[in-house]
């Protein structure tokens, strides 16, 4: 075998020089502590059923706000159905409904705890930061359920503090049978 060439199982020969010249992945930046604290607050308020406080984290401009749980990560929200596809008005309506306590699918109410981890900044400009995180949500209502996936938060920095303008939740088991999402995921 020639110099600089190496045999790799099943008769496959790889040029050793090109094998080492491949682009290595680089870590994404971590969110700053203020952004992480905001993500943890959003998760805690949802877990504790503090719906009005959770809603207050959202920006007020209806044309940019999006809360979505697609059936598939590549789905176009304009042309496909989603488990949740809310604008700002719909978020307000969802929270008002949750606050009544009159949801058959939440009687008794779920007890929830979620873990948000592996958070990475995927985009940032002067006013906004987009963070992707893994999440695991443990829900107990009559029996235990487990929800997991990747969540994308876009947060705007403003004079009145941080405001959520986009939350997209990609469930691991999206596309399959999903029980009711009668809570904030």
Predicted regions and their residues:
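Short, low-complexity N-terminal intrinsically disordered segments enriched in polar/charged residues
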Residues: 2-52, 56-57
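Hydrophobic pocket/interface hotspot
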Residues: 42, 54, 91, 131, ...
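A beta-strand edge to alpha-helix "cap/lid" segment located at domain peripheries
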Residues: 14-19, 111-113, 120-185
């Amino acid at each position: 075998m020639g110099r600089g060439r190496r045999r790799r199982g099943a008769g496959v020969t790889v040029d050793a020089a090109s094998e080492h010249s491949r682009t290595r992945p680089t870590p994404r930046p971590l969110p700053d502590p203020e952004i992480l604290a905001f993500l943890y607050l959003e998760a805690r308020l949802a877990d504790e059923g503090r719906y009005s406080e959770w809603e207050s984290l959202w920006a007020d401009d209806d044309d940019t706000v999006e809360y979505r749980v697609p059936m598939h990560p590549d789905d176009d929200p304009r042309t496909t159905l989603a488990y949740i596809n809310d604008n700002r008005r719909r978020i307000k309506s969802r929270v008002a409904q949750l606050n009544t306590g009159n949801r058959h699918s939440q009687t008794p109410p779920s007890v929830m705890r979620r873990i948000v981890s592996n958070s990475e900044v995927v985009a940032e400009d002067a006013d906004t930061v987009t963070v992707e995180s893994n999440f695991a949500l443990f829900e107990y209502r009559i029996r235990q359920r487990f929800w997991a996936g990747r969540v994308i938060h876009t947060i705007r920095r403003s004079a009145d503090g941080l405001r959520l303008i986009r939350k997209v939740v990609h469930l691991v088991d999206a596309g399959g049978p999903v029980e009711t999402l009668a809570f904030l995921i």
